[in-house]
Amino acid sequence: YVDEKVGLENTLIVLSADHGGPEAPPDMQQYGFESRYVDPESWEREAAFAALKERFGIGKPLIQQFNPPYVYLNRELIAEKGLSQGEVETAVAAELIKFDGVALAVSSTALTSGDLPDTPLLRSVLNNFSPRRSGDVYVVFSPNCFIREFDGSAVAVTHGSPWRYDTFVPVIFAGAGLKPQKIYREIHTVDVAPTLSALVGTKPPSGTRGKILVEVLEGR
């Protein structure tokens, strides 16, 4: 359709990704690297987690689901018991961070309040947090640790990871009039929107946070 109706000479193709593509644990292990799968379904069976539930008087499953990177708690059960949502979130995060394969666990209550240290890791977590849409506890797996099963498949990559191998992605502009070149400075995927706006001569979208990639404009 593009070839026939628009013409490639009038088309700009932009490619990127929403996460990286690291090697799977079996591949890394054969070269001597420490890497493993994590099984979130086992967390609630851990003795420490059982003790936490006993402390709160909870006899039913507390974790409703794990949709990376968020744990979703059974809010109806928490309310039924007359418990503080924030207190339960904080307690769950404190236990999860002790488990193998978990580098960080932060309650949504803490992320909402902003009462957290200003570190690169937590800044990355905050960039992926929305009080209205996010889960109850943000879980960051340790480097080279991946979820064992998601939607029926073992995976080596998923959303929400702040590590370099998962945040390093390509940004490719291809089209008539662009000069072939490679850019080695650090850029961000959010730079694509304002760059496209500059190319077509319009104002960038209201939610734009990126910067114009001047190399793309200079290459035309």
Where are these regions (language model features)?
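Short, solvent-exposed loop/turn elements at domain surfaces
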Residues: 146-150, 180-181
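Short, well-structured beta-strand/strand-turn elements
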Residues: 103-104, 202-209
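Feature representing long, continuous alpha-helical segments
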Residues: 90, 94, 124, 132, ...
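C-terminal non-catalytic regions of proteins with extracellular/luminal or membrane-system context
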Residues: 3, 124-125, 173, 209, ...
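Short, surface-exposed loop/helix-turn segments at secondary-structure junctions
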Residues: 149-157
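Substrate-binding rim/cap in mid-to-C-terminal beta-strand-loop elements of soluble/periplasmic
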Residues: 38-86, 156-199, 214-220
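Secreted, luminal/periplasmic, and some membrane-associated catalytic domains
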Residues: 1-148
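Short, well-ordered loop/turn and helix-capping segments at boundaries between secondary-structure elements
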Residues: 22, 30, 98, 177, ...
